[in-house]
């Protein structure tokens, strides 16, 4: 989407021309755009010898090229900004156009129509057209100026949600593009992928003031780029120019103007969360400066933003409270060095490191402090060289640092103890609620080299290479001296647990789980690509490309862990200029996109994890009438005066469940990985139509179909390998596909195959209830959608944008996360843990948002006073109702799409898990309610002279304070229990954010 409006200009000289513009989507990870155009005339002589010059309004730099014999010209790889264009012939200026906007990842298309032979002054009208009749990609552009007009929250996710086909509100806080999970997207800043290399639901956090332009890619990427099966947000930061500029802004969201959060109650009417007592005050301010170091040559931009975010949350009937504070600052800057007009060097550095301290209180008394650190320092270097008029080179180096540190003042001396019993009134009964101590550093070092070569008038070749080295340094453990977490459950005699039948030794049992993960892990991904943009005829353009990817991971000991290569991705796009006037097009796109795993899997399975679970009876465990334990625990006093609880462990139940061992940590783990493992991929097909109704209005439609399959997962396999040494239970491969392993068979190495689609659990293994081999289906996800768009561009008075999306996402695999379990560790999800998980998991997936309406707009009441609005209405997501257990396997630990309806309690003599009767619960048959949100804004601007101004704004988000339920407790039974009903079933667990008011002021001079 373009934000520019071009007024009429008078031009003098020999050839009269009319210019018309169209923003053209291009590659999504570029930090630049381009200008291309054509001179049209009935006489070839009027075209020959014409030269085109563009000048960057901000920096004064310029480039000049001569049109070809058909009147075509192209300026690729231009920095984002505003340009003036002039056409000359025989030394005389024949045409000009001012203030042509170049957006990130887009080409502005210029059309010159020669009107006569006489040299005369004519009037030229420039208009912005959102139609590029050569493009087959799907993208949405919006700049900082337009965003400032709208009531949009100051976050990258809020920008992306403006685009059709995107949906928010997912469990992991990220976005879904085209039905994808939140872990399949990428965010780029000036060409560098700043997505977390390990858990890609997060990315580098940059203040809005630092950004200049955004492009949201929702499908149809060219062969230049891959490694994503969702969507992309491509952003560029501000640059300096020949004029010194200074900006100061402040944004305040006071708690006193917020709507009250909902209180949460259990099904008996008891308050469990005092949302109405929660408080959040947010304040940010920034100062920035830009200008020339050397006029026309070297420029700077610098920004500093301190911030203060204070949050108070009250839970559990006012018994516990948390107070969080973040007062860290952001700094960032950019240097642009124009070595010559044909060679540009850019350097960007910023730090988004954030430290948050959270004090926890129980019954008014201080208990502990949680310390969290995220973000880090980031660096980008870009070089652009215009080697000839037809050959351009772009080189990029960048480094991203993403810290993820979490610790607590009590973590060394306090084990986490969690009460899962039906009578327990509170969850954490120990002296810490910290999930894990964590000291993780994720780094991404990127290098890429891209070429564009205009071979002939009809063929533009793009080719290049890119490489990423992703490093994860991991040190995580459960809190406590022994890194052990204790979970307390009700024990029902006769029930099966860990391969044994429970007795009446105790009313409770304990799961004691010791877990540590440590080591250095690395993944290297590389790719080469080739693409031809072929102008078949004057009205038909074909984009034909191919991409080759590979990735190679290294485990904790420095040895190879997993390698996947020969990921070949064909891409084909067609675009037809229906009337030959550049105002209507039909386009189609087909392509394959691979999803190499992030570092999440290797960091947990690559030789650096020790995970041991034991089950015990709780000795002398007694609860009072209110559900509090009065015995069964040993109390010790910590140095801070806190009481640490350690369960008194009785008899052990079954054998230890162990993965990894300190004695062999760091050893080669590649023997557990399928020799022929294949990467996940998605095939995508798009058919679309766009047309300009008039100079300001455009409409469009797009249909999309996607199919994602071939997941990589850790799989729990119970199989007799015959004369070969067992590789263990946890193996890594493609569920539902043939797995090949190198095993030691009677002293010789042999390649052994297992079709996991037929056998993941042997029929004679105790885990099989049916007595037959149980295999896993192939994981897959399908998505179909139709987008309808109406766009009225800004004309200094008003603008309007509306979209409607019908979409359907279905299958048995969400993608890189599992919203059903809150697991965001791609490749380490539950889908491979038991074949019944995928057998019963078919249906509408978590990101199936069937209907979405989006509207936004702005209206200038006067030149200084503006009002604006943004509205979103979405149908509810599916609810996946589940219970514990299934009719195929004896595993009664996981929640699956069945519920026990007969023989669900303790088993009598002679009975087994096979006697239980289950009812199937199809995925996603229930739905949440629709959600609605209206945001309103108004701003008033004041000029203090020619170069100074101030803007004061008021934005109200969620005006009507609607707080519809976004998620519910969908578990019919309690954890690790086949027959115990879950008393919290159906309760809302997440809601829309309440109304908030943002006050802001911006001063520029």
Segment roles from a protein language model:
Residues 26-125:
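Periplasm-facing N-terminal accessory domains of Gram-negative outer-membrane beta-barrel systems
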Residues 68, 91-111, 121-239, 270-273, ...:
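Periplasmic N-terminal accessory/gating domains of Gram-negative outer-membrane beta-barrel systems
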Residues 276-355, 371-395, 399, 570:
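Transmembrane beta-barrel wall of Gram-negative outer-membrane proteins
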Residues 318-322, 434, 458, 462-583, ...:
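Signature of Gram-negative outer-membrane beta-barrel scaffolds
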Residues 537, 541, 692, 696, ...:
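Gram-negative outer-membrane beta-barrel transporters
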Residues 556, 562-566, 575-774, 913-915, ...:
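Solvent-exposed loop/turn elements at secondary-structure boundaries
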Residues 696, 710, 808-810, 815, ...:
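C-terminal beta-signal and adjacent terminal beta-strands/loops
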């Amino acid at each position: 989407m373009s934000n520019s409006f071009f007024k009429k200009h008078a031009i003098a000289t020999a050839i009269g021309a009319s210019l018309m513009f169209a923003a053209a989507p291009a590659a999504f990870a570029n930090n630049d755009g381009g200008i291309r155009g054509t001179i049209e005339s009935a006489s070839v002589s009027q075209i020959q010898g014409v030269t085109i010059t563009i000048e960057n309004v901000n920096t004064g730099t310029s480039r000049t090229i001569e049109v070809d014999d058909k009147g075509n010209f192209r300026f690729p790889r231009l920095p984002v900004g505003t340009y003036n264009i002039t056409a000359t012939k025989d030394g005389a200026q024949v045409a000009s156009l001012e203030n042509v906007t170049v957006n990130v990842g887009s080409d502005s298309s210029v059309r010159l129509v020669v009107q006569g032979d006489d040299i005369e002054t004519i009037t030229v009208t420039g208009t912005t057209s959102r139609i590029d009749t050569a493009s087959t990609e799907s993208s949405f552009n919006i700049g900082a100026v337009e965003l400032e007009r709208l009531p949009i929250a100051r976050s990258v996710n809020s920008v992306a949600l403006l685009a059709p086909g995107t949906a928010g509100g997912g469990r992991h806080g990220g976005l879904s593009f085209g039905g994808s999970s939140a872990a399949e997207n990428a965010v780029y800043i000036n060409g560098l992928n700043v997505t977390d290399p390990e858990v890609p639901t997060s990315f580098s956090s940059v203040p809005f003031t630092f950004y200049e332009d955004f492009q949201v890619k929702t499908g149809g990427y060219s062969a230049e780029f891959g490694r994503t099966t969702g969507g992309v947000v491509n952003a560029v930061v501000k640059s300096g120019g020949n004029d010194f500029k200074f900006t100061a802004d402040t944004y305040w969201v006071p708690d006193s103007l917020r709507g009250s959060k909902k209180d949460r109650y259990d099904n008996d009417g008891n308050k469990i969360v005092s949302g109405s007592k929660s408080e959040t005050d947010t304040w940010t301010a920034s100062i920035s400066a830009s200008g020339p170091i050397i006029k026309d040559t070297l420029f700077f931009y610098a920004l500093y933003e301190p911030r203060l975010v204070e949050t108070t949350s009250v839970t559990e009937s006012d018994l516990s409270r948390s107070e969080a504070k973040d007062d860290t600052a952001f700094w960032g800057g950019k240097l642009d060095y124009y070595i010559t007009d044909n060679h540009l060097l850019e350097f960007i550095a910023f730090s988004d490191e954030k430290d948050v301290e959270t004090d926890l209180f129980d019954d008014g008394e201080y208990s502990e402090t949680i310390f969290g650190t995220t973000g880090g320092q980031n660096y980008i270097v870009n070089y652009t060289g215009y080697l000839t008029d037809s050959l351009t080179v772009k080189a990029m180096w960048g480094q991203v640092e993403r810290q993820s540190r979490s610790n607590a003042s009590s973590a060394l001396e306090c084990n986490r103890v969690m009460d899962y019993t039906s009578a327990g009134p509170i969850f954490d009964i120990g002296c810490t609620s910290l999930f894990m101590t964590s000291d993780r550093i994720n780094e991404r070092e990127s290098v890429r080299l891209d070429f564009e070569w205009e071979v002939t008038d009809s063929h533009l070749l793009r080719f290049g290479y890119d490489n990423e080295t992703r490093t994860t340094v991991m040190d995580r453990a459960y809190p406590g001296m022994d890194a052990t977490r204790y979970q307390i459950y009700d024990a029902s005699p006769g029930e099966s647990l860990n391969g044994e039948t429970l007795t009446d030794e105790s009313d409770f049992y304990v799961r004691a789980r010791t877990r540590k993960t440590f080591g250095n892990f690395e993944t290297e991904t590389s790719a080469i690509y080739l693409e031809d943009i072929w102008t078949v005829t004057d009205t038909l353009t074909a984009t034909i490309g191919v991409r080759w990817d590979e990735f190679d991971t290294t485990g904790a000991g420095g040895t190879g862990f997993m390698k996947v290569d020969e990921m070949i991705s064909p891409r084909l796009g067609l675009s037809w200029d229906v009337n030959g006037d550049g105002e209507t097009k039909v386009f189609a796109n087909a392509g394959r996109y691979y999803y190499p795993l992030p570092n999440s899997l290797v960091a947990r399975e690559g030789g650096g994890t020790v995970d041991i679970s034991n089950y015990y009876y709780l000795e002398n465990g007694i609860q009072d009438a209110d559900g509090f334990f009065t015995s069964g625990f040993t109390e010790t006093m910590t140095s801070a005066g806190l009481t640490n609880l350690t369960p008194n462990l009785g008899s052990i139940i079954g054998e230890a469940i162990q993965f990894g061992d300190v004695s062999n940590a760091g050893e080669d783990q590649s023997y557990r990985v399928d020799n022929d493992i294949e990467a996940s991929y998605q095939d995508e097909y798009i058919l679309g139509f766009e047309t300009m109704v008039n100079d300001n209005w455009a409409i469009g439609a797009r249909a999309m179909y996607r199919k994602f399959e071939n997941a990589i997962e850790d799989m729990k396999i119970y199989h007799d390998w015959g004369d070969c040494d067992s590789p263990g239970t946890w193996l890594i491969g493609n569920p539902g596909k043939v797995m090949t392993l190198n095993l030691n068979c009677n002293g010789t190495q042999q390649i052994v195959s297992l079709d996991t689609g037929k056998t993941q659990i042997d029929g004679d293994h105790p885990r099989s209830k049916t007595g037959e081999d149980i295999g896993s289906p192939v994981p897959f996800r399908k998505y179909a959608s139709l987008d309808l768009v109406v766009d009225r561009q800004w004309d200094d008075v008003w603008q309007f944008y509306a979209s409607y999306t019908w979409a359907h996402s279905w299958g048995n695999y969400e993608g890189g996360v599992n919203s059903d379990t809150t697991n965001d560790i791609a490749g380490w999800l539950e889908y491979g843990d038991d074949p019944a998980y995928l057998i019963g998991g078919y249906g509408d997936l978590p990101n199936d948002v069937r209907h979405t309406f989006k509207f936004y707009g702005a209206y200038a009441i006067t030149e200084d006073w503006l009002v604006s609005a943004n509205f979103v209405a979405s149908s509810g997501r599916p609810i996946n109702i589940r219970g514990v257990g299934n009719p195929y396997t004896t595993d009664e630990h996981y929640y699956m799409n069945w519920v026990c309806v007969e023989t669900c309690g303790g088993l009598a003599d002679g009975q087994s898990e096979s006697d239980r009767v289950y009812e199937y619960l199809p995925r996603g048959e229930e739905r949440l309610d629709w959600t609605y949100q209206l945001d309103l804004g108004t701003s008033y601007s004041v000029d203090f002279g020619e170069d100074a101004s101030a803007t004061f704004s008021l934005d109200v988000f969620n005006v009507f304070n609607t707080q519809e339920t976004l998620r519910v407790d969908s578990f019919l039974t309690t954890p690790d229990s086949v027959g115990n009903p879950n008393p919290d079933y159906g309760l809302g667990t997440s809601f829309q954010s309440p109304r908030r008011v943002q006050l802001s002021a911006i001063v520029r001079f």
